[in-house]
Amino acid sequence: MPCHSSAAKAKCLADIMIDTHTHIYEPEFDQDRDDVVKRAVEAGVDKFLLPCINQESIPGMKALAQRYPQYCHTMTGLHPEDVHADWQDVLDSMWDKVENPVAVGEVGLDFYWDDTFRKEQIDAFEYQICKSVDMDLPLVIHMRNAEPQLLDAMERHKADGLRGIFHCFGGSRESARRMMRYEGFVFGIGGVVTFRNSRLAQTLSDAVPLDRIVLETDAPYLAPVPHRGHRNEPSFLPFVAAKLAQIYNVGIAEIDNITTSTAQRLFSI
């Protein structure tokens, strides 16, 4: 693979990667979506997993998966910030619109900006946990300012053999150790690990083994250094892999091989 771009240079000694969480179906990519996919593939990203946010996400996700069936896989679910009093009707209307989802996500609890619908968020999350069990699919979990409530909900279903990802993990060592108790779950690590003021590198080194990590971008959000502050995209994933290689003192190829194997096993792709 010729190493023309900075991302490709970071990737030259590495193997195939999977972006387990990317929103490249969103309007931020309308002007250059095909180029975004091309750059990512050239950088070594072999799969793009597309989390569902709400009903409006579905047409774009489906169109992208139909255009790039060899690369793109869709999820189904309702993001906690989109949970309102009518959450049950919303989920009932959208559930069967995503064909062959690889996960239930992006779901969870978020009390950061507004907890008006706190009870509804918890009810919707538990409903979607049950759906994931019924469908034998992993969960992709979003959590912000809600760790005790979210882990309480998961504990009520622990006997169901839950599995999935704690998406965009950026918590403390104590949080990581609590989440490590859920043996079917791994940690989604993205651009935040490259930020100079982030303590995530030390947390991972202290508390999370490499085989419990998968790569993600959360594009268009949270671009890694050296692209911080700009639109994120999957071709930047090598910068995350390179940082993890430093943290775990292994080669980039080993990071890619282990995280890819973990993602393939979790999502059956």
Per-region residue spans from a language model:
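Mid-domain alpha/beta scaffold segments of enzyme catalytic cores
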Residues: 2-269
